[in-house]
Amino acid sequence: GLPSQVTKHAFEVGKTVATTPGAVVFRNELLELIQYKPMSEKQYARPLLVVPPQINKYYIFDLSPSNSFVQFALKNGLQVFMISWRNPDVRHREWGLSSYVEAVEEAMNVCRAITGSRDVNLMGACAGGLTIAALQGHLQAKRQLRRIASATYLVSLLDSQLDSPATLFADEQTLEAAKRRSYQQGVLDGRDMARVFAWMRPNDLIWNYWVNNYLLGGNRRFILS
């Protein structure tokens, strides 16, 4: 196993993370849509829909009151909507990019209906960015791209031909093995994915915790995951 990076029980959604007031206003098979309570006297008419990575949680944008993109946006007059992805299991092995695109399109239309705005601003992070890029292509094909006023991408690799750390693990045999395992299990286990990301930056994400928390005794609750 690998050394743990955090104490798992130190965080609780709604108390120590994701504390910004909001409510689920829409739900479909793949996601929930959260609308946050305004934090400014006036708000812009056009809403912002944030699409997090499918392999992460929505509260990466709302870690704490002092470290929250959501609160920053709200205090600057934006109407913020956030997607919270469902954790898939073996029943959802057939979900593909088109499934996620259709789910985001539904959520986007709910944002428009709630706010009365003809269009929305989109922000996608990592795989969420790939999803909104595909959504834009889908809408362009239907001649409905005007429903999106702007799109912002955070660490979204749109050209897979470019070299990146991920290509170290992306030879044809490895990809085929990953596909077979994912289909057999129904999903790619999050722990397996975490190991891949950790070995991309071993000094920061593996040996740092091994040395400081175990060898130097910085964390007596040190465990291997």
Feature-to-residue mapping (PLM):
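Active-site proximal loops enriched in glycine and acidic residues that flank catalytic Cys/His/Asp
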Residues: K37, P52-P53, S84-N87, V104, ...
